[in-house]
């Protein structure tokens, strides 16, 4: 499975691509897309959309793992991050790539074993899991952490989705015939 992790932000949008499964994850790519604060908002959003669309087309991930947006204390920051989040959703929908959201505590627990882990512990586990010596950007590190989290959770999510679909089909009378 190929997963693109995304740490959404308007000034800095982290991207990290991994492939494999939870036991054998391989690092393929990471980058932090940066927009200039002097750019007008439409230009910033257009740049993020164009770059993300290009990367989705080039790398063709099976899924996107994005940081679930938590309530932020500063309304202006929340608004800007929300706009970047919307651009990510649009680009993924256009590319036909499913999005899975994970909260910060869920990512920390998945990688370190505790939801109270600090940033350095998460970065250490990302580097150790992927065999990376240097990660120069926290946003890209967060994106890789999100991708690894999805690799760990994907098998369980797929099973849950199949069971839910079977339950819906049974309730509506559309259950497949058993032979």
Swiss-Prot record:
Binding site for Mn(2+) 1: 7, 139
Consequence of changing residue 67 to A/Q: Loss of HJ cleavage
Effect caused by changing residue 139 to A: Loss of HJ cleavage
Sequence motif DNA-binding loop, location on chain: 68-74
Main location: cytoplasm
GO cellular component: a single term: cytoplasm
Cofactor(s) in the UniProt record: Mn(2+)
SUPFAM superfamilies documented for this protein: Ribonuclease H-like
CDD domains per UniProt: RuvC (cd16962)
Cofactor note as given: In vitro only Mn(2+) supports endonuclease activity; Mg(2+) inhibits binding to HJ DNA. Another study shows Mn(2+) is the preferred cofactor but Mg(2+) does support cleavage. Binds 2 Mn(2+) ion per subunit.
Catalytic activity reported: Endonucleolytic cleavage at a junction such as a reciprocal single-stranded crossover between two homologous DNA duplexes (Holliday junction)
InterPro entries from the UniProt entry: RNaseH-like_sf, RNaseH_sf, X-over_junc_endoDNase_RuvC
GO MF term (any one): magnesium ion binding
EC number(s) per entry: 3.1.21.10
Presence of keyword Ligase: no
Other remarks on this protein: D.radiodurans metalloenzymes exhibit a strong preference for Mn(2+) rather than Mg(2+).
Family that this chain belongs to: Belongs to the RuvC family.
Quaternary structure (record): Homodimer which binds Holliday junction (HJ) DNA. The HJ becomes 2-fold symmetrical on binding to RuvC with unstacked arms; it has a different conformation from HJ DNA in complex with RuvA. In the full resolvosome a probable DNA-RuvA(4)-RuvB(12)-RuvC(2) complex forms which resolves the HJ.
Protein known as: Crossover junction endodeoxyribonuclease RuvC
Protein source organism: Deinococcus radiodurans (strain ATCC 13939 / DSM 20539 / JCM 16871 / CCUG 27074 / LMG 4051 / NBRC 15346 / NCIMB 9279 / VKM B-1422 / R1)
């Amino acid at each position: 499975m190929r997963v693109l992790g995304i740490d959404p932000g308007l000034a800095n949008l982290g991207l990290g691509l991994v492939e494999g499964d939870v036991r054998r994850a391989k690092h393929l790519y990471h980058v932090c897309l940066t927009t200039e604060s002097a750019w007008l908002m439409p230009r910033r959003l257009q740049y993020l959309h164009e770059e993300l669309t290009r990367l989705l087309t080039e790398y063709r991930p099976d899924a996107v793992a994005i940081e679930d947006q938590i309530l932020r204390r500063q309304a202006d920051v929340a608004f800007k991050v929300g706009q970047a989040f919307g651009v990510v959703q649009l680009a993924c929908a256009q590319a036909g790539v499913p999005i899975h959201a994970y909260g910060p505590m869920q990512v920390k627990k998945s990688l370190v074993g505790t939801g109270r882990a600090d940033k350095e512990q998460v970065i250490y586990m990302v580097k150790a899991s992927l065999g990376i010596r240097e990660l120069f950007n926290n946003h890209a590190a967060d994106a890789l952490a999100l991708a690894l989290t999805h690799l760990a959770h994907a098998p369980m999510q797929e099973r849950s989705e199949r069971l839910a679909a079977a339950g819906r089909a049974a309730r509506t009378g559309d259950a497949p015939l058993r032979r």
